[in-house]
Swiss-Prot record:
CDD domains: Commd3. It comes from the Eukaryota. This is COMM domain-containing protein 3. It comes from Mus musculus (Mouse). The gene is Commd3. Keywords: Cytoplasm, Ion transport, Nucleus, Sodium, Sodium transport, Transcription, Transcription regulation, Transport, Ubl conjugation pathway. One of its GO terms (cellular component) is cytoplasm.
Length: 195
């Protein structure tokens, strides 16, 4: 597992008994799993009276580091021994390693389901519609007399089977630029498929 320096510092702070005693560690670890797996979870998990004695900046940094470590472990489908070895390298004691690994094993299936539901591909444009919007005056004192275009792209997301819309407004130059870039992309795709 490759984690950034900032995340590693947060994990090492979490491992330090001087910063987090065993009760605070357990509460923060559960809060990290809860914030990832429960859509209704909010920051109230960090408002536990036992965590009030910890500097809020350190608390949030360690919470984010723990959540990142959990997500990376789930992403790479890390087993207990690999996670244990990583936590040992981060100066965790045996008790904290055991608690972290137990929480991870208990929530591993939910975590993998969550990560599996995240899309892996970009949406595909299936249709486009537009309408002319003519601005006569803005909130400024001068008049504008220039057309604008309201564009709606209908897209299909293969991973979630949903059909959302992307709406935006642009002026004539921006629309011409968009059309030119789409034509260039189409030609590039045609050349790539012919190779």
């Amino acid at each position: 597992m490759e984690l950034s320096e900032s995340v590693q510092r947060g994990i090492q702070t979490l491992a330090d008994p001087g910063s987090f005693d065993s009760n605070a560690f357990a509460l923060l670890l559960r809060a990290a799993f809860q914030s990832l797996l429960d859509a209704r979870a909010d920051e109230a998990a960090l408002d536990h009276p036992y965590l009030k004695q910890i500097d809020p900046v350190v608390l949030k940094h360690c919470h984010a580091a723990a959540a990142t470590c959990i997500l990376e472990a789930g992403k790479h489908q890390v087993d207990k021994s690999t996670l244990s070895t990583y936590l040992e390298d981060c100066k965790f004691d045996r008790e904290r390693i055991e608690l972290f690994c137990t929480e991870y094993q208990n929530n591993k299936n939910s975590l993998e389901t969550l990560l599996g539901s995240i899309g892996r591909s970009l949406p595909h444009i299936t249709d486009v519609s537009w309408r002319l919007e003519y601005q006569i005056k803005t909130n400024q004192l001068h008049k504008m007399y220039r057309p604008g275009y309201l564009v709606t792209l209908n897209v299909e997301n293969n991973d979630s089977q949903s059909y959302p819309e992307i709406n935006f407004s642009c002026n004539m130059e921006q629309l011409q630029d968009l059309v030119g870039k789409l034509k260039d992309a189409s030609k590039s795709l045609e050349r790539a498929t012919q190779l």
